[in-house]
């Protein structure tokens, strides 16, 4: 028998442990500080003490993390390029994304996952390139191994992804581990899913040795795939993200809708439904879609109907320079002409009587 109190009990732990997140700075801002690691460590407000200690103790790792911010934010913007919210970052905002990620939404889940993955990727790459004193190539990949093609020798430089994951967990999760509220648990879950996603795409690369390429001896190593593979994977997880509530003892999650499966460690989880992101809203941090380019012939999320939220669009006639008449010349060049191409660009209208700032 289903009790009417059952729903109350499901939500009670969430209500008891929920606190509205505050707009605070994050390690995400490290990519904007520049300068030395000391400048970075001392000028990113919001770092907890253990993060600052790691920052001062490992300046070379912090440089890698700071450079990596540009990579994972660019990947986020690529994945959301055809959506109303396009993972836009805010200049001079210490939180990098503003208020939009205060909501425990699918978008927050994705950003926490992709940022955590980005840290693993950046640190691991820096280790392999000899840019970090405390790590190098994977020391476990030594001696011989065997695969479907036979025996091989471990050689080259296998990416030390275990070090990247370990450091990322210690640094990225530090602030969330200090909190016991629902949002902290959500962030920790999505951080872990992001870290695991990078390791999923480790690939074995080999080089043949022998007379005339006979491959009588193979040397192999493990290498991370391009970060786009991780971005594409997390994008699929975003589209299949699972809405959850806190369980009764407040230590984990249960699905909000019993028809859906329980989330695994690889799934992204969220608590709140997303806003529609149609209009500029200071409360939610949405910049709206006025001025966004839309696709008149598309039926997807980038269509003018969906992107512009039914407000209509303006059309501009523009010209652009393109390469044309390209010919191959022996040997070995391709020569092209410069041509002008005329095209129509469609941009979403702003809401009527709105105090509007066109998003960038």
From Swiss-Prot:
<feature type="lipid moiety-binding region" description="O-palmitoleoyl serine; by PORCN">
    <location>
        <position position="212"/>
    </location>
</feature>
<keyword id="KW-1015">Disulfide bond</keyword>
<dbReference type="GO" id="GO:0005615">
    <property type="term" value="C:extracellular space"/>
</dbReference>
<feature type="signal peptide">
    <location>
        <begin position="1"/>
        <end position="25"/>
    </location>
</feature>
<feature type="disulfide bond">
    <location>
        <begin position="127"/>
        <end position="135"/>
    </location>
</feature>
<feature type="disulfide bond">
    <location>
        <begin position="294"/>
        <end position="304"/>
    </location>
</feature>
<keyword id="KW-0732">Signal</keyword>
<feature type="glycosylation site" description="N-linked (GlcNAc...) asparagine">
    <location>
        <position position="295"/>
    </location>
</feature>
<dbReference type="GO" id="GO:0005109">
    <property type="term" value="F:frizzled binding"/>
</dbReference>
<dbReference type="InterPro" id="IPR009140">
    <property type="entry name" value="Wnt2"/>
</dbReference>
<keyword id="KW-0325">Glycoprotein</keyword>
<feature type="disulfide bond">
    <location>
        <begin position="76"/>
        <end position="87"/>
    </location>
</feature>
<keyword id="KW-0449">Lipoprotein</keyword>
<dbReference type="GO" id="GO:0060070">
    <property type="term" value="P:canonical Wnt signaling pathway"/>
</dbReference>
<feature type="disulfide bond">
    <location>
        <begin position="308"/>
        <end position="348"/>
    </location>
</feature>
<dbReference type="Pfam" id="PF00110">
    <property type="entry name" value="wnt"/>
</dbReference>
<feature type="disulfide bond">
    <location>
        <begin position="278"/>
        <end position="309"/>
    </location>
</feature>
<keyword id="KW-0964">Secreted</keyword>
<comment type="function">
    <text>Ligand for members of the frizzled family of seven transmembrane receptors. Probable developmental protein. May be a signaling molecule which affects the development of discrete regions of tissues. Is likely to signal over only few cell diameters.</text>
</comment>
<feature type="disulfide bond">
    <location>
        <begin position="326"/>
        <end position="336"/>
    </location>
</feature>
<feature type="disulfide bond">
    <location>
        <begin position="206"/>
        <end position="220"/>
    </location>
</feature>
<keyword id="KW-0217">Developmental protein</keyword>
<feature type="disulfide bond">
    <location>
        <begin position="331"/>
        <end position="332"/>
    </location>
</feature>
<dbReference type="InterPro" id="IPR005817">
    <property type="entry name" value="Wnt"/>
</dbReference>
<dbReference type="GO" id="GO:0045165">
    <property type="term" value="P:cell fate commitment"/>
</dbReference>
<comment type="similarity">
    <text>Belongs to the Wnt family.</text>
</comment>
<dbReference type="GO" id="GO:0005125">
    <property type="term" value="F:cytokine activity"/>
</dbReference>
<dbReference type="GO" id="GO:0030182">
    <property type="term" value="P:neuron differentiation"/>
</dbReference>
<keyword id="KW-0272">Extracellular matrix</keyword>
<keyword id="KW-0879">Wnt signaling pathway</keyword>
<protein>
    <recommendedName>
        <fullName>Protein Wnt-2</fullName>
    </recommendedName>
</protein>
<dbReference type="InterPro" id="IPR043158">
    <property type="entry name" value="Wnt_C"/>
</dbReference>
<feature type="disulfide bond">
    <location>
        <begin position="324"/>
        <end position="339"/>
    </location>
</feature>
<feature type="disulfide bond">
    <location>
        <begin position="208"/>
        <end position="215"/>
    </location>
</feature>
<dbReference type="InterPro" id="IPR018161">
    <property type="entry name" value="Wnt_CS"/>
</dbReference>
<feature type="disulfide bond">
    <location>
        <begin position="137"/>
        <end position="157"/>
    </location>
</feature>
<dbReference type="GO" id="GO:0048513">
    <property type="term" value="P:animal organ development"/>
</dbReference>
